[in-house]
Amino acid sequence: MEHVLEEFAGGKMHVDLLAVEGATYRADPPSAMRVSGKPLTEWIRAIADSADYTVAVGTCASFGGIMACGRNPMGTTGLQYYREEKGGLLGTDYRGRAGLPVVNVPGCPAHPDWIVGTLWALRANRVTEADLDRFNRPRAFYGKLAHHACPRNEYYEFKASATVYSQQGCLFENLGCKGTLCESDCNERLWLARTGSCTRGGFPCLSCTSPVFPDRFVPFFETAKISGIPTSLPLDVPKAWYVGISGLSKLACPERLRRNAVSFKPAWSGKKEPPDDGH
């Protein structure tokens, strides 16, 4: 193994693509993982210098993720970003031999399509810097919001919100959903053999593809507010518009949505909701 790594690191063997999963260190602590006597970060730097492309797989490798949260006493970081700050292990100016910076494929976890699709497109030389967003994520996968195609969108549009989990309404206003902040195509692409997503399962989106996940999105299961207004507002609507539109939307909310939002079973117009017997 050491011989092969030396060949890659020294440029004696061609490296089409280096994919790294998991956070790395800015400076190696004594407990840092070593391979053949050298810190793993040293191998990553050397092989990245020889690689045509370098890919960070998952939020930890991309931005530091969970391993870099809080005070980050271990000094963990992503390959080319530390949260929103460019730099990371490989530095701001790093580029692979094909000319691209580190291509970030965040997610906790990253969707298999995002990983395989990115690797294939890079290997086929079909990715340019214009295809990457401001955090070097492929726009094809991260150019939308998880909110898009969420089955609860009708409730969201009229601000008909659930107050407890398992109710039918939107989870954004009260229950911590960050789908309007999460840049990903989760609700269009779907997970679990194309059957579901976090919000389709009644669970709030945590915006795990974001460079500031998880710290910036706590509390996870309730919505932080100031004077009744969520502190984190949707990315696709100007903040002043959102505040104004929200009030009008609630006033215009159909009774059907208002009722179903706090119901555990949809009650269709003209039909009475069955009594809640606790089952």
Model-derived features: positions:
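Class I SAM-dependent methyltransferase SAM-binding "motif I" and its flanking Rossmann-like core
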Residues: 64-98, 103, 107
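Iron-sulfur (Fe-S) cluster-binding modules
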Residues: 1-19, 92, 96-104, 117-279
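Extended, subdomain-level signal for the structured scaffold at the beginning of enzyme domains
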Residues: 1-44
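Glycine-rich nucleotide phosphate-binding loop and flanking beta-alpha elements
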Residues: 25-26, 61-63, 212
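Short acidic, glycine/serine/threonine-rich loops at helix termini
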Residues: 30-31, 65-70, 116-118
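Short, conserved loop/helix-junction motifs that constitute active-site signature segments
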Residues: 45-51
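Early transmembrane alpha-helices of polytopic membrane proteins
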Residues: 110-112
